[in-house]
Amino acid sequence: MIYGVGTDIIEIARVQGVMERTRGRFAEKVLGADELAKYHARKARSERRGLAFLATRFAAKEAFSKAIGLGMRWPMTWRAMELMNLPSGEPTPICHGELAQWIAERGITVRVSVSDERDYAVAFAIAERGGHAAVPENPA
């Protein structure tokens, strides 16, 4: 059963502007530890791909927060949910701490899709309840 849906779109140039104004601290505020490591690896290869990665993760967190009905309020925080990829490439939300507990208590599963083009990054999330395992705290 559908619990909620969420979507977000962001202009990549806006993310670039925030990164310049914050001297890169924006990435540290928004990304979890595993996401941050992946961001730095992508940025080292291509500044543009690093920004696109950051923008898709920002959009994914916004879409995820809307799908679960909390918005960006406790226990949903920027770093409480990381969007990582399975070996197949499928993006998978990984929840930590109190958010993982909140999701598990409600039996919610969330699927997220992200995409980016030259100017924009977009994310869509669908939260379901019943008949599925909850979003894991740690990838298997």
Curated annotation (Swiss-Prot):
Reaction catalyzed: apo-[ACP] + CoA = holo-[ACP] + adenosine 3',5'-bisphosphate + H(+)
Catalytic EC class: transferase
Annotated InterPro entries: 4-PPantetheinyl_Trfase_dom (IPR008278), 4-PPantetheinyl_Trfase_dom_sf (IPR037143), ACPS (IPR002582), Ppantetheine-prot_Trfase_dom (IPR004568)
Compartments where found: Cytoplasm
Major localization class: cytoplasm
Keyword tags: Cytoplasm, Fatty acid biosynthesis, Fatty acid metabolism, Lipid biosynthesis, Lipid metabolism, Magnesium, Metal-binding, Transferase
Entry EC no(s): 2.7.8.7
Lineage top rank: taxon: Bacteria
Annotated GO CC locations: cytoplasm
Binding residues annotated for Mg(2+), in chain numbering: D8, E62
GO BP term, pick one: fatty acid biosynthetic process
MF GO annotations: holo-[acyl-carrier-protein] synthase activity; magnesium ion binding
The family this protein is said to belong to: Belongs to the P-Pant transferase superfamily. AcpS family.
Function: Transfers the 4'-phosphopantetheine moiety from coenzyme A to a Ser of acyl-carrier-protein.
HAMAP family in alphabetical order: AcpS
Protein name per the record: Holo-[acyl-carrier-protein] synthase
